[in-house]
Amino acid sequence: ILSDETKCQLSIRNSVTEKWNTELIWGLSSRSDAHLQSLCMTRVGAYPNNMWGGQEMLNPTMEATNLYYTKNGVPMDEDKTWNYADRFKVKMHTNEQPYELASYYETIQMNFDREPRFYANIGFDGCTWYQYNCPSDSEKDIWTAKNRAGQAQGKLGTNSYTTTGYWTKKL
């Protein structure tokens, strides 16, 4: 059973890729986007060092991640309850957002208390990542992205890493 938070994230992600979505602007039915998708996202899976993906050339920019609102529905720098000045300071996640952030893991404060679209579309160090190859249909086995040096989603080879600290979860 999935949480409401995870269902919301999946709904947002699938709205972009749902086949023949009524909001489709341009469609190409004969091709797969699997290769492009694998270039954009990190290596999440049981054996991330044996996977290919997460190319450094296709990462969301910091400017793009700044455009997402806080959980209060306003820009980060306008939210009076959100500490914009400390957004790059490291904070320990103590499980107050179990469906968005890895439990008891440190990440920057900018990744806390953001709107659902941020967690649906953007991957980062310390995020949770629910997808088709999770070990079960429950969040207890959800993937987490850990991209520091020597960690599962850290730099692998000459071009399998993120230059900005962020990945695209779904095109």
Where are these regions (language model features)?
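Active-site beta-strand/loop architecture of penicillin-binding DD-peptidases
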Residues: 149-171
